[in-house]
A protein has these predicted regions:
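Exposed, interaction-prone extracellular/peripheral surfaces
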Residues: 1-173
Length: 173
């Protein structure tokens, strides 16, 4: 059975798990038409999902995880405690992972519209340290709830990243 829930502050679309012919195609269609939102709030969508999930299974959460790690833990851990096999697919753009700026640049937050000017010194040192610390915090959060964390660079084909992860899972047993 396969299903999907697309959410931002609230549930945008929910297709319950089903094993009928065409279910996977419906999930792909839902993901394909999903639009970026002005932020994400985990509490309501995750409680909505937990109320509706009937059987144990694999739950993949796909996000940039620009959220507080405690909020992530508080809202995803109940799924793991229900016996769900949780995977956090952490999507980041190459420019988020390794920014390369030569002069002061104005960056605009696509979710809030807030703009900030940043210097090359900040981006090449402090930002790099902060993003690595955040990725590490998400990894530790996943580990703390016995979930997998998979960092995906959006410049890589998704099928390659998924294949690598599935190969890792198969070897792990």
């Amino acid at each position: 059975a396969v299903g999907v829930m697309v959410f931002a502050d609230n549930v945008v679309e929910y297709r319950p798990p089903a094993s009928r012919s065409g279910s996977l195609q419906g999930v792909i269609h839902t993901l394909d038409k999903a639009q970026p939102a002005k932020g994400t709030e985990l509490k309501h969508p995750m409680s909505h999902f937990q109320e509706r999930i009937k059987r144990r299974g694999l739950v993949a959460v796909i996000s940039d995880f620009y959220c507080d790690t405690q909020e992530l833990l508080d809202n995803i851990r109940p799924l793991a405690m229900q016996g769900q096999d949780v995977i956090l697919f952490h999507l980041l753009d190459p420019a988020e992972l390794n920014p390369n700026i030569k002069e002061s640049t104005l960056y605009e937050d696509l979710e809030t519209g807030h703009a900030i000017e940043v210097s090359p010194v900040f981006m090449n040192k402090e930002y790099h340290d902060r993003i690595r610390a955040h990725i590490s915090a998400i990894q530790n959060t996943a580990s703390g709830m016995n979930a997998d964390h998979v960092l995906i660079n959006t410049s890589e084909p998704l099928d390659k990243a998924l294949h690598s992860y599935l190969t890792f899972r198969e070897k792990r047993g």
